[in-house]
């Protein structure tokens, strides 16, 4: 049905081993990425753009706005407003990255508007900001589900 669920890999005794990241084989320069995400209470993930820049995916409903809220460019750009829904509800992200300028529309509200991105965020798989890179969904922090993922390159 087009849904990706990030379930942990577990041995028979049920102890957690690890989660995995899901990444594209193809690499991208400029693109638009639209998706839906469901974050259970207390969980988090991230969406890495070009393998460099993390859009935070976290249960931050009702929390003070900062650069670690849902939809933020992690530790770099704080959303202009809180647009989160309560944990466990499906939410929409519409992310555009052109050159090194980022726009994020979260649940229909533009929370980052064509802001410049300066340098990779933590967890980046490269430091080359001039090259194309993969999109990957961080999978080591909890049970976050993604669905209806549409990635459109911009020429």
Question: What label would you give each PLM region?
Answer:
Residues 1-155:
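Carbohydrate-interacting regions of secretory-pathway proteins
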